[in-house]
Swiss-Prot record:
Keywords: Ribonucleoprotein, Ribosomal protein, RNA-binding, rRNA-binding. InterPro entries: Rbsml_uL18_euk. One of its GO terms (cellular component) is cytosolic large ribosomal subunit. This is Large ribosomal subunit protein uL18. Disulfide bonds: none annotated. It comes from Haloferax volcanii (strain ATCC 29605 / DSM 3757 / JCM 8879 / NBRC 14742 / NCIMB 2012 / VKM B-1768 / DS2) (Halobacterium volcanii). Belongs to the universal ribosomal protein uL18 family. This is one of the proteins that bind and probably mediate the attachment of the 5S RNA into the large ribosomal subunit, where it forms part of the central protuberance. One of its GO terms (molecular function) is 5S rRNA binding. One of its GO terms (biological process) is translation. Part of the 50S ribosomal subunit. Contacts the 5S and 23S rRNAs.
């Protein structure tokens, strides 16, 4: 295994494919809080974090499960819920006194229009100042879930099991976004 002077064992979190230390160092050198966006198939998480000597300090956080408080009934792992989670995290960050941040996508691939950038766009629309390129942000119809509603209309059976009808997703998105904006 790791015997001899020419063999270098990577750091534990790098071996576990959890941390890109080169990217983390670049983000920390910026001196701004990080908007940490993490996505899975079921949920989306967004946190505003600053580094500290005893470890990172979280100033504001939101998960897509928090959207239930604002009337979200759709699944929580899709693009519209990622946008709303970023919006909620941005509002909470502004309430905590954080106004600027940089996006930390972790080990996610920087594909234009994906859920990580939807979190960023939601936080920007909430009022956070985050440096970005408009080319990576999804168009507004995609953030609202129009593509999901169009796909659901083509199917013979419902897209989601349960009471929620995916064809109403854009209207539902607008309703929940209105609830988030009223909560100011």
């Amino acid at each position: 295994m790791a015997t001899g002077p020419r063999y270098k064992v990577p750091m534990r979190r790098r071996r576990e494919v959890r941390t890109d230390y080169h990217q983390r160092l670049r983000l920390l050198k910026s001196g701004k809080p990080r908007l940490v966006a993490r996505v899975s198939n079921k949920h989306v998480r967004a946190q505003l974090v600053t580094p500290g000597p005893q470890g990172d300090e979280t100033h504001a956080a939101a998960t897509s499960a928090d959207l239930d408080e604002y009337g979200w009934e759709a699944p929580t792992g899709n693009l519209p819920s990622a946008y709303l989670t970023g919006y909620l995290a941005g509002k909470r960050a502004l309430a905590a006194g954080v106004e600027k941040a940089v996006l930390d996508i972790g080990l996610n691939t920087a594909t234009p229009g994906n859920k990580v950038f939807a979190v960023q766009e939601g936080a920007i629309d909430a009022g956070l100042e985050i440096p970005h390129n408009d080319a990576v942000l999804a168009d507004w119809d995609r953030n609202r879930g129009v593509h999901i509603a169009e796909y659901a209309e083509q199917l013979d059976e419902p897209l989601y099991s349960g009471e929620f009808d995916a064809t109403n997703l854009p209207d539902h998105f607008d309703e929940v976004l209105g609830n988030l904006q009223e909560d100011e």
